């Protein structure tokens, strides 16, 4: 008899992940989607994880971060602010599936699936 580990088809649940997708903004970024597995910096600075060379975006504008299974957005002292569903972000803010985060004039859709 052999010893080993096997999976029975359909028994393992797919783990949910948070993704952020650019919906409105520079043409070259529209449709870009990334899975959030750690802190994600959004800004104009080339060292950012999502680099947006558009007006109204600061060098280090905002940060997506995970706390357990929850995703948060935090404004990093940007000049033009960050919004969630049209409301200004004043402190780290918990996000929900399908929320829209606005950084400058760029809209980023958040999904949990």
Annotate the PLM regions.
Residues 67-70:
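Short, conserved beta-turn/loop elements at beta-strand boundaries and strand-helix junctions
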Residues 72-82:
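Short, basic/aromatic beta-hairpin or loop at an interaction surface
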Residues 57-59:
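Amphipathic hydrophobic-ligand
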Residues 1-53, 65, 102:
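Intrinsically disordered, low-complexity acidic Ser/Thr-rich regulatory segments
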Residues 83-113:
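C-terminal boundary/linker segments immediately following FHA domains
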């Amino acid at each position: 008899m052999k010893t080993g580990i096997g999976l029975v088809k359909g028994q393992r649940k797919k783990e949910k992940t948070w993704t952020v997708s650019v919906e409105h903004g520079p043409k070259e970024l529209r449709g870009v989607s990334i899975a959030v597995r750690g802190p994600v910096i959004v800004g104009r600075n080339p060292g950012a994880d999502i680099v947006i060379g558009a007006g109204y975006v600061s060098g280090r504008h905002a940060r997506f971060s995970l706390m357990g299974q929850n995703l948060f957005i935090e404004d990093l002292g940007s000049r033009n602010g960050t919004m969630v569903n049209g409301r200004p972000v004043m402190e780290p803010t918990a996000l929900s599936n399908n929320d829209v985060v606005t950084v400058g004039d760029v809209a980023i859709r958040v999904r949990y699936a």
